[in-house]
Amino acid sequence: MKHCLVVDDSAVIRKVARRILDSLSFSTSEAENGRDALEQCRTSMPDAVLLDWNMPEMDGIAFLVALRKEVGGQEPKVIFCTTENDVEHITRAISAGANEYIMKPFDREIIEEKFQQVGLL
């Protein structure tokens, strides 16, 4: 079973994302900021990270840059899931090493499609 780390400062978003991912046969864990997510990745690397942009302590971009620097390459797959939907944010995310980008609000079909596109389903 593949594992996805859900990183968002909103408990509601984490809960909704986990339900969707559970329905897609993923095991899940969660973090409420990038710093906690990075610590979890150091302990046990997930197959995927569903990542918010704006979070306290360490935002999504800072997390992604640190993660890619530590592990190199394109693993785990990182999919941003955020309200930041302008071209500048999308470009920054992809340049930092994101594999995909989802805009909130999201539903099961969008998550499933993006996870298929990056080879997780």
Predicted regions and their residues:
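Charged docking surfaces used in two-component/phosphorelay signaling
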Residues: 15-23
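Helix N-cap/capping motif at the beta->alpha junctions
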Residues: 30-39, 60
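Short amphipathic alpha-helix used as the core "switch/output" element in two-component signaling
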Residues: 39, 61-74
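Active-site beta3 strand of CheY-like receiver
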Residues: 44-50
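Receiver (REC) domain active-site loop signature in two-component systems and cognate sites
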Residues: 55
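Alpha4 helix (beta4-alpha4-beta5 surface) of REC/receiver domains from two-component response regulators
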Residues: 62, 85-100, 110-113
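A Lys-centered signature of the CheY-like receiver
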Residues: 104
